[in-house]
């Protein structure tokens, strides 16, 4: 008999429900269904037909918007307005891939350098894919993975984080109600031990992981032993570099939004704020005011900007990181206190480059602020972590923007803006933030076979 685990509302501490872990024979049956679908569905459906199913999933996000948002508020404490935005964005992603499916799968002619004849690249489905998804954006993350791969004709085994099984159930219902055939999308409540043999199963052809560096490394190790392709979207410690602005209050507001999105529990949230010396004092005061005004509150209430952290474990970890930073010389400018799973928006200064705190990802509403004396110092500090997911740059100097953007070691650089994700733009990082891309054309090309056909 399979065991169960409790899902707890992080805002209230109440148990939402007990959920069963999947038994080995049930998991093998899910792989069987996904394998059968991968052998029949792509050949029995057109790209346009698959796109219509994907489009319907996006429409169901709109039709069930409030219900879906309330689920994620209960499961992880996401403020309701942010939860609604997540549902909307997930729906947009499905719509994008439905709109562009034909172009994504179209033959790609190659101009020959010499000789007669033609050459082209023909795309075909990769097969059964395992998606290992996080708790922090349960709808958005699945859309990034499922949207492109289902229009391609891949079939999906989706392992959700144990914190969000109700979200997972709601998504399975949407795929079923949209009309996907059995096995095209299979929600599985698998344990880490089970996932190891799922990856090794020869019927599973690729794996996509969004999660911690540790989780990604563990999956990549198993996949490597079995020669399986892997896409990893892992942690980040994104810099927010402020070198110039005509609107310091606007810069502080942008910084607050970049740090507090999803209560700071976002891999590409800004976490380290690197500020030019001449702007530092005024910026720090305005930033302090913004974070002090963003009080944690009831995630079900409109206007709440900061909810609880996702679990007691997450709150314990963040509290410990802040304590260790203070013990090593950091100073608290604002915040720093915890109550239950809530943690006050916090600013730390006095962290030295190379300190333990400067090398870690703080997954919560804690900002580190650094003073720099030059552009060179700012770039050096931005690049001195093992991560390289996203980055933010604010400057009035276009030439400086070009120089700094080129030198930042990150997969995404946002210049003079925040919150700029869009379905057509690739998402992914450098260094220990992972490899491969999601979203856009690049995301759709990760799990597709590309065959050269050369004709005389």
Language-model features, listed with the residues they occupy:
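N-terminal Rossmann-like NAD(P)+-binding subdomain of aldehyde/semialdehyde dehydrogenases
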Residues: 1-117
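Residues at or immediately preceding the N-termini of alpha-helices
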Residues: 10, 24-27, 47, 65, ...
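Conserved C-terminal structural/oligomerization subdomain of aldehyde/semialdehyde dehydrogenase
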Residues: 12-18, 204, 241, 295, ...
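Residue-level signal for inorganic ion chemistry
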Residues: 13, 50, 72, 94, ...
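Short, well-ordered beta-strand elements within core beta-sheets of diverse protein domains
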Residues: 15-22, 39-43, 130-131, 240-243, ...
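Rossmann-like NAD(P) dinucleotide-binding subdomain of oxidoreductase/dehydrogenase enzymes
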Residues: 108-250, 372
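ALDH superfamily catalytic-core signature
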Residues: 214-352, 415
């Amino acid at each position: 008999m399979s065991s169960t685990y409790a899902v707890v509302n992080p805002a209230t501490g109440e148990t939402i429900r007990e959920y069963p872990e999947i038994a080995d024979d049930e998991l093998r049956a899910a792989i069987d269904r996904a394998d059968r679908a991968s052998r029949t569905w792509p050949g029995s459906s057109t790209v346009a037909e698959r796109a219509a199913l994907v489009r319907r999933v996006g429409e169901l996000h709109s039709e069930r918007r409030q219900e879906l948002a309330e689920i994620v508020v209960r499961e992880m404490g996401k403020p309701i307005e942010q939860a609604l935005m997540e549902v909307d964005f997930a729906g947009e992603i499905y719509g994008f891939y439905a709109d562009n499916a034909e172009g994504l799968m179209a033959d790609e002619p190659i101009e020959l350098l010499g000789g007669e004849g033609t050459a082209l690249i023909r795309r075909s489905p990769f097969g059964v894919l395992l998606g290992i998804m996080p708790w922090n954006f349960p709808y958005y993350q699945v859309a990034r993975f499922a949207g492109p791969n289902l229009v391609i004709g891949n079939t999906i085994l989706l392992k959700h984080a144990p914190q969000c099984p109700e979200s997972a159930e709601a998504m399975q219902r949407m795929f079923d109600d949209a009309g996907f055939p059995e096995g095209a999308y299979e929600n599985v409540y698998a344990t880490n031990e089970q996932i190891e043999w799922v990856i090794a199963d020869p019927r599973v052809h690729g794996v996509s992981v969004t999660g911690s560096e540790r989780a990604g490394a563990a999956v990549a190790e198993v996949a490597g032993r079995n020669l399986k392709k892997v896409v990893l979207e892992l942690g980040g410690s994104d810099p927010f570099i402020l070198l110039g602005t005509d609107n310091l209050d606007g810069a502080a507001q942008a910084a607050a939004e970049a740090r507090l999105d999803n209560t700071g529990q976002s891999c590409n949230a800004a976490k380290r704020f690197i500020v030019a010396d001449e702007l530092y004092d005024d910026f720090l005061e305005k930033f302090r005011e913004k974070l002090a005004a963003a009080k944690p509150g009831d995630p079900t209430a409109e206007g709440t900007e900061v909810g609880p952290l996702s679990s007691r474990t997450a709150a314990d970890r963040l509290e410990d990181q802040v304590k260790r930073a203070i013990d090593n010389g950091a100073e608290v400018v604002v915040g720093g206190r915890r109550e239950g799973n809530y943690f006050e928006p916090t600013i730390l200064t006095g962290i030295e480059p190379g300190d333990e705190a400067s090398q870690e990802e703080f997954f919560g509403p804690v900002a580190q602020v650094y003073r720099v004396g030059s552009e060179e110092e700012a770039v050096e500090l931005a690049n001195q972590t093992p991560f390289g997911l996203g980055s933010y740059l604010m400057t009035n100097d276009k030439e400086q923007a070009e120089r700094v953007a080129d030198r930042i070691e990150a997969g995404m650089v946002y210049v003079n803006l925040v919150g700029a994700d869009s379905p057509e733009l690739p998402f992914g990082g450098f260094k220990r933030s992972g490899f491969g891309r999601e979203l856009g054309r690049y995301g759709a090309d990760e799990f597709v076979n590309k065959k050269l056909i050369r004709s005389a």
